[in-house]
Amino acid sequence: MPTTPLRKTAMTTRQPIYKSLYFQVIVAIVIGILIGHFYPETGKALKPLGDGFIKLIKMVIAPIIFCTVVSGIAGMQNMKSVGKTGGYALLYFEIVSTIALLIGLIVVNVVQPGAGMNIDVSTLDASKIAAYVTAGKDQSIVGFILNVIPNTIVGAFANGDILQVLMFSVIFGFALHRLGSYGKPVLDFIDRFAHVMFNIINMIMKLAPIGAFGAMAFTIGAYGVSSLVQLGQLMICFYITCVLFVVLVLGSICRAHGFSIFKLVRYIREELLIVLGTSSSESALPRMLIKMERLGAQKSVVGLVIPTGYSFNLDGTSIYLTMAAVFIAQATNTHMDITHQITLLLVLLLSSKGAAGVTGSGFIVLAATLSAVGHLPVAGLALILGIDRFMSEARALTNLVGNAVATVVVAKWVGELDTDKLQSELASGGSAILETRPEDDLGVAEGPTPANAVNTTKTV
C-alpha cells in the first residue's frame, strides 16, 4: 500500500480555530483579566493554576536539554563545529544584548519617565524588597562562573539550573562521541527517552490555557488595573521600546540574513501567547527546541543556542535593566552624569548575563546591579515592585523573539541552516504541534534506527 510521510500529513492537517492552542490561550487570558478585575479575591486564589503549569514545564526542561544537547553533539562528525557554534553564539549574544542595553539607556534619558516624581527615598518601604536585595548580593562574576559548575550531577537536574545542566550535557556529549560505536546503545536510549519527553510536553501544553488563565487572574487581582496608572509612563515607554527593538534592531538582523521578523513572529505565535500568559520565557523553551529545528536549524545548533540564550541573550531584560535603573535615579532626584551611566552600563554588561528566563529573575539582577553600582538607592526598587510583574511580560516576549532570531542567525553563520526549509516554513506560518513527529525527536543523531524507521510513515 502507498505510504505518506508523517511530515506531509502533519503539515496539511487543519483544525477548527477553537481547537488551536493560541486561540484557547487568548480566550483564557481575557477571562483571567475579567475575573481578576471584577473578583480580585477569586483572582488571587487562582495563583496556583499558573504556578502549577510553570512547575510542570520546568519539570521536564532539564532532561529535554540533556537529550537535545547530548544527541546533537554525540552525533556530529566534526567536533570543531561545536566550538565554532558556541563561539559565534556568544559573539552574537554580546553584540545584541549590548545594543539592547544602549537602547534602553538612550530612551530613558530622552523620555525621562521618572522626572518630576520627587520621591523621598527615606519614605519608601524597603521591607518588601529585602529578599530581592539579599538575593542580588549573591550575584558576582566569580560566583556566577562557579555556579555554572554543579556540585553534583543529580543536583544540577534536581535544581533545574539550565547552565549547570547544559555544561554537564556538553561534557557528556563529547565523552559519548569519543566512545564511537561502543556508545551507540547509550545514544539510542537517549533518542527514545527524548521522544518520551517531547510527548510529555505535548500533554502538558494542553493545560497551557488553564495556566495562563490562573496567572493572569492573579496578576490583575493582586495588583489591579489601577496600579498601572501611577507608573504607566514607565510601562508605556518600556513596551514601546521593546516593540521598536524587535521591529527595528531584530528586524534589521533578520532582513540582513534573508528572512522576515514578522513571519518569524507569526511562526512562533503560540509560544508567544504561552509566554504572555505566564510571564516566563522558560515556559516555551521545550516547544522552541522543536520549532527551531523544524525551521531548518540543525539540532546541534538549536541544542546549544536556545538553552545558552536563556542566560546570555535576554534582550528584553537588558532593556528593562537600564531603563529601570535610570528611572529610579530620576524619580529620587539622584544625579547621574555620563560617568555614572557608563559605569552602570559596564556593570550591566556582566550582571545581565546572570538572568535566567524565569519570572522575577530580572528584578533580582536589578537589585544586584544597584548594589554593585553603589550610587543608586537600592530602596528605590520599591517604586517599581508593583508593576514589575506587568513589565515582565514584555521582557519575556522580547527575550523569546531574540532567542529565535539568534538561533536562525547563528545556524546560518556556521552553515547549519536549511534556507529552503526556513523559507517554506515561514511562508506557511508553521503548523501547530498536534503531535510529536519522529523528526522532532531531537535525539536522532545519525538517522532513524530500524525501529524508528517503521514509524516514519503512515499508511493511508
Swiss-Prot record:
Main location: membrane
Cellular location(s): Cell inner membrane
Transmembrane segments: 21-38, 53-75, 88-110, 153-175, 196-218, 231-253, 301-323, 363-385
DNA damage among keywords: no
One annotated GO molecular function: succinate transmembrane transporter activity
Pfam families: SDF
Domain of life: Bacteria
Keywords for the protein's UniProt record, in alphabetical order: Cell inner membrane, Cell membrane, Membrane, Symport, Transmembrane, Transmembrane helix, Transport
GO CC annotation: plasma membrane
GO biological process, one term: L-aspartate transmembrane transport
Topology in membrane: Multi-pass membrane protein
Stored InterPro entries: C4_dicarb_transport, Na-dicarboxylate_symporter, Na-dicarboxylate_symporter_CS, Na:dicarbo_symporter_sf
SUPFAM superfamilies: Proton glutamate symport protein
PROSITE patterns referenced in this protein's UniProt entry, alphabetically: NA_DICARBOXYL_SYMP_1, NA_DICARBOXYL_SYMP_2
Region (Disordered) location: 438-460
Function (record text): Responsible for the transport of dicarboxylates such as succinate, fumarate, and malate from the periplasm across the membrane.
Family: Belongs to the dicarboxylate/amino acid:cation symporter (DAACS) (TC 2.A.23) family.
Protein name per UniProt: C4-dicarboxylate transport protein
